[in-house]
Amino acid sequence: MSTPFKMERGVKYRDAAKTSIIPVKNIDPNQDLLKKPEWMKIKLPASSAKIESIKNGMRRHGLHSVCEEASCPNLHECFNHGTATFMILGAICTRRCPFCDVAHGKPLPPDPEEPQKLAETIQDMKLKYVVITSVDRDDLPDRGAGHFSECVKAVRELNPNIKIEILVPDFRGRITQALEKLKDNPPDVFNHNLENVPRLYKEIRPGADYEWSLKLLREFKEIFPNIPTKSGLMVGLGETNEEILQVMQDLRDNGVTMLTLGQYLQPSRHHLPVARYVPPTEFDEFRDKANEMGFEHAACGPFVRSSYHADLQASGGLVK
């Protein structure tokens, strides 16, 4: 009889070590992969000085960026532009979604000094708009909502003119408590991603629930009717265009005013494969449909991610 796998606290489990403990076994690391089309090829910047400067600033304060931890394809562009999405509550997620490259495991307790470190780093970088996200922390009673609130408070105290967007997890089973924690320090934009269509949730987002996520977005909007709510979807995981359009309508029906839609990219052979590459023309069609549905802003394109040019998204600029 085999010995049950036991995770060590503070250890990052990635790739095969992570996906081997996902309940739904649907990944064959030896399968043939789709060839990337021309429109999915990235041009790297000639200089990496700005990129290294941001990375070093993060390391110096013991902070993390989702750009690095999730292997975002836009890292070079965003870092070279002088922007980054900060990831609080550590770099180990309690979930093990097979599309995501963030490490899974038993995370360490939250760093009580992180809000101040974050505020000082943002001040040093002279940012005017910042996105703060986190790993899932199902191990915490409030799922990390209180820490989000403390981070927003600290950042605003040192950077009074900054605009803050938070990209939050679903606060599983603690939505009411989480929103109560956020009341004293609300963001300028509230973002929570649905990721994909409900039919594929068991395969793509084990541990999550489509209706929970809609409830979170809806109830935040009921409490803060004047704060924009935002959500994002990945395409190319086996969903149909009709299903995506229905999710977009569900978002509008629950008060969401900002949408991001981008192509899913497989971080490694141990993650879910790309089912298809969606051409740019289809993203344009999704954006047109989003505008017809009444979204105030829709960023739709192959490389669009939730926080990709988030400052431009918030100001109503075209992002694709």
UniProtKB/Swiss-Prot annotation:
Chief location: cytoplasm
Pathway of action: Protein modification; protein lipoylation via endogenous pathway; protein N(6)-(lipoyl)lysine from octanoyl-[acyl-carrier-protein]: step 2/2
Record GO terms (molecular function): 4 iron, 4 sulfur cluster binding; lipoate synthase activity; metal ion binding
Subcellular location: Cytoplasm
Residues bound to [4Fe-4S] cluster 2: C93, C97, C100
Cofactor binding: number and manner: Binds 2 [4Fe-4S] clusters per subunit. One cluster is coordinated with 3 cysteines and an exchangeable S-adenosyl-L-methionine.
Catalytic activity line of the entry: [[Fe-S] cluster scaffold protein carrying a second [4Fe-4S](2+) cluster] + N(6)-octanoyl-L-lysyl-[protein] + 2 oxidized [2Fe-2S]-[ferredoxin] + 2 S-adenosyl-L-methionine + 4 H(+) = [[Fe-S] cluster scaffold protein] + N(6)-[(R)-dihydrolipoyl]-L-lysyl-[protein] + 4 Fe(3+) + 2 hydrogen sulfide + 2 5'-deoxyadenosine + 2 L-methionine + 2 reduced [2Fe-2S]-[ferredoxin]
One cellular component term from this protein's GO annotations in UniProt: cytoplasm
E.C. number(s) listed in UniProt: 2.8.1.8
Cofactor: [4Fe-4S] cluster
Keyword entries, A-Z: 4Fe-4S, Cytoplasm, Iron, Iron-sulfur, Metal-binding, S-adenosyl-L-methionine, Transferase
Annotated positions binding [4Fe-4S] cluster 1: C67, C72, C78, S307
Keyword Iron-sulfur: yes
Enzyme category, top tier: transferase
InterPro entries, A to Z: Aldolase_TIM, Elp3/MiaA/NifB-like_rSAM, Lipoyl_synth, rSAM
UniProt key word Iron: yes
Residues annotated as domain Radical SAM core: 79-296
Family statement drawn from the similarity comment of this UniProt entry: Belongs to the radical SAM superfamily. Lipoyl synthase family.
Name under which the protein is recorded: Lipoyl synthase
Species this protein is from: Haemophilus influenzae (strain ATCC 51907 / DSM 11121 / KW20 / Rd)
